[in-house]
Swiss-Prot record:
Protein name: tRNA sulfurtransferase
Keywords: ATP-binding, Cytoplasm, Disulfide bond, Nucleotide-binding, Redox-active center, RNA-binding, Thiamine biosynthesis, Transferase, tRNA-binding
Organism: Thermoplasma volcanium (strain ATCC 51530 / DSM 4299 / JCM 9571 / NBRC 15438 / GSS1)
MF-aspect GO terms: ATP binding; CCA tRNA nucleotidyltransferase activity; tRNA binding; tRNA-uracil-4 sulfurtransferase activity
Function: Catalyzes the ATP-dependent transfer of a sulfur to tRNA to produce 4-thiouridine in position 8 of tRNAs, which functions as a near-UV photosensor. Also catalyzes the transfer of sulfur to the sulfur carrier protein ThiS, forming ThiS-thiocarboxylate. This is a step in the synthesis of thiazole, in the thiamine biosynthesis pathway. The sulfur is donated as persulfide by IscS.
Segments forming domain THUMP: 54-156
Amino acid sequence: MKTYLVRYSEIGLKGDRERARMERILADNIINYYKKIGYEARCQLLAGRLLVEAENDIPLSKVFGIKSYSECIRIKFENQEDIVKKVHALYEEKVKGKTFGVRCRRTGTHSFTSIDMEKAIGDALYSISNGVDLKSPEVWIHVDIVGKDALIYDKIYKGPGGLPLGSEGKLISMVSGGIDSPVATWLMMKRGSPCDIFFCSLADPIDTQAFLEIAKKLVERWSPYRDGNVFIADCRDLIRDMVIEKKTNFNNVTFKKVLYRLAERLAEKYRYLGIVTGESLGQVSSQTAENLLSIEHGINFPIYRPLIGLDKDEITAIARDIGTFPEKNVGEFCSLFSAHPVTRSKWEDIEEDVKKIDIEKFIERVTAIKFSEIGKIVINSDLMLNKNLEDAVFIDLRKKDLYEKSHYQGARHLDLEQALAINDTSKKYVFYCSMGLQSAYVASVLRERGIEAYFTTFSKLSKQKGSVDETIGKRV
């Protein structure tokens, strides 16, 4: 078993009772993370730090509340010379011909000061080294002294920081298959709030598959010791209500308000303390200040938007760092509601729009699964085109001007309403669009009618040699 010195920052600023509570939660989370991945671990509180005994450090870079950690050698000592001898034995070879520096921290009463210890170790190693450098040495030697214990180490690894998961109240997070919302969820988890996840599927099973892949990464990496809930709502009929039947007038904003209402109902039922979203001010049309007011108006729970002031580049960098950046993009809802986006809505208009949507219908279509079940769900990806279908009818769902500029050879152009009206079961159909979400939605609806339908994207079809007609300025 190895010994790791684990440091935290904010926990140490709390009052005695709250600090003790958070330290217990942090220690439990560390032990449970190790247990979840098949290892045993022991934790001991030592003067505002934790000592962890385990076979490896896999969980320590991923447990919220850990500021940093170091693999260390722990020794008992009687006097200063005991420590100097041990450090000399450990670092004689490591500092040979190299510059080095020594840093000592003490807790307790001793016959020597921290500076005394640094000088003594420096004197013992100086003759075999290339000198002392206290700015950027080739080898750092750290000695933390607590009572009669000395912890010796030379490397410091970064943890995620924040507060221990479970030290704050439980939230429900609206997560998509995109970049932003998983990052928002992670940031609230970092602040100590366990987050259960709510997802609205518009093109099941394709967008559900993309969402589950990201949710699995988020959960397995950052909270495998917590078996929370995932709620998946089948919202395909929203597209019919809003786009085909045109029941609503401000689709890009009204859609988000409907999602807020669904999340609100789940928060009421499961006693969540707030709703987390991945909105960043002004990033897309539904995220202007006016539209966020309209979306949030009348929601009886706090809305947490940890990304509100971040640029897309900053969000993307965090997504890559925490491992939730999507490997493939199937598009998000905005591609279905982007025809005439409203950027300066009035909350009264959005409320009237929402009244035209049967919220109860979609609440009844919510499926709940546990985090531990995510990896067991097998999505049927047969909808995705992965074979040659020369006898199929190809349908282009992109905007008409894009179709007229270039399209798959022999493809017909249909809008969403026309495509959904297809009822000929004797033919095979391949639908394509720019991002894949609209085509996946149409294919899934037609499959339920017994029609052999597939989906793909224009870019994938374009890679086939001689498959694209370039028809700029005229119709085919």
